[in-house]
Amino acid sequence: MRIQWFGHSAFEITSSDTRILLDPFISNNPVCSTAVEEFEPDVICVTHGHADHLGDAMEIAERTGALLIANHELSVFFSRQGLESTGMNIGGKISIDGIGIRMVDAKHSSDIDFTEEVTSGGSACGFIIETREGKVYHAGDTGLFADMRDVIGEIYRPDIALLPIGDRYTMGPEDAAVAAGWIKPEKVLPMHYNTFPVIEQNPEIFAELVERTSPGTEVVILDVGGFYEY
């Protein structure tokens, strides 16, 4: 399994021949140099409706025919734009090409904020991608919440966690380190930081905190465009 980071919360997970793109904020992402036209995903998962997460999802889906996966409200919005989409809700799971995609809770807002009028984008979420190589938890935008320990950590037990550390709009390094301690993944990759001045963070500080909260977890810090093989 290959996990590639494109800055902010944009990742592509490749397992066998299936490519899953998550929160593809690409063309307006100031730290990403990859062109939108380079993406050829099979599936696009969107955690919520904010423009820095929905990003280029609709453009990529229209060009490639990729299936959009999101909460019910966003899925209806996508379908009304003529795009192939399937809706889910918290706790649900679907399977595509032998890969499980489970929607889990996140503590954040989700209005669609790039149209002329702000409209409801349903509830923000995270995803657990279950491949034959392992499980990856993409937290989306979220604050710290107890189900990270009681549900995500205790029941779903992801091998890899992708956690926001930018603060202000999500967890900061301290709370993200607590989350890592609750979830206890084998690996944790920080995300949603250093895209804009208001979320500037030093990921090495996060790594130092995780050494204390979850000594068995390795922190993997990727450069933008870099990837990790698991």
UniProtKB/Swiss-Prot annotation:
Belongs to the UPF0173 family. HAMAP family: UPF0173. This is UPF0173 metal-dependent hydrolase MTH_1902. Disulfide bonds: none annotated. InterPro entries: Metallo-B-lactamas, RibonucZ/Hydroxyglut_hydro, UPF0173, UPF0173_UPF0282_UlaG_hydrolase. It comes from the Archaea. It comes from Methanothermobacter thermautotrophicus (strain ATCC 29096 / DSM 1053 / JCM 10044 / NBRC 100330 / Delta H) (Methanobacterium thermoautotrophicum). Pfam families: Lactamase_B_3. Keywords: Hydrolase. One of its GO terms (molecular function) is hydrolase activity. Transmembrane segments: none annotated.
